Amino acid sequence: MAMQIKGVIFDFDGTLLDSVELRITAWKKAFQNFGVNVPEDLIRPMIGYPGIDLAKKFVKNPLDVEMLQEDYFLKNIESAKFFQDVIPTLAELRKRGIKTAVVTSTRRIVMQKFSLQVDHVVTIDDVSKGKPDPEPYLKALKMMGIPAEECIVVGDIENDLIPAKKLRCISVLVKHGRDISSNYADYEIENIADILNVIDHLAEKNNR
């Protein structure tokens, strides 16, 4: 797996943005508005999937529910913050000449609320199939102009890592203090800044 890393693709919710709890609350309130009480433990594993897929599991009018939760999320977006090491890490990647992208199941209207210094953004609105299908990653790789083998994918759930493994990207699970692990991860890191250590490690392997 020795190679030079030329790009990093990040998931957004739960990876760069500390927003999972807000997203869960938004879904619960949206379902409740339509008379459906969906427990948190059923919503949480679906965060990161296309919203329409989550809604379809519980209601017959999934688009209406999805749009309502997006509306709640947008109205309360100020409570969601980037993890503290995100901005300096993105700046360091840019300094090193490493291309960056975000691949997210979030809609573009939400992403437009954030000023994020990455080269490319692929939202659920830009593809016909969302994660875990590889399509969003293929689109990002094409935009970045690099092969999958020279790209790292960073995510906080297996839904982010499964398509990365299919494409032979290097998959990295970021924990953010959670006691989690994944068989789909080539590396596991505690925070976003640790991705720089992964890149350095791969560079050392390449020079041996």
From Swiss-Prot:
Keyword Membrane: no
GO molecular function: phosphoglycolate phosphatase activity
One BP term from GO: DNA repair
Gene3D superfamilies: HAD superfamily/HAD-like, Putative phosphatase, domain 2
InterPro entries documented for this protein: HAD-like_hydrolase_sf, HAD-like_sf, HAD-SF_hydro_IA, HAD_2, HAD_sf, PGP-like_dom2
One Pfam family recorded for the sequence: HAD_2
UniProt enzyme class: hydrolase
Coiled coil: none
EC number: 3.1.3.-
UniProtKB keywords: Hydrolase
Active-site positions on this chain: 11 (nucleophile)
Annotated disulfide bonds: none
NCBIfam families listed in its UniProt record: HAD-SF-IA-v1, HAD-SF-IA-v3
Protein family: Belongs to the HAD-like hydrolase superfamily.
Function: Catalyzes the dephosphorylation of the artificial chromogenic substrate p-nitrophenyl phosphate (pNPP).
Protein name: Phosphatase Ta0845
Source organism of this protein record: Thermoplasma acidophilum (strain ATCC 25905 / DSM 1728 / JCM 9062 / NBRC 15155 / AMRC-C165)
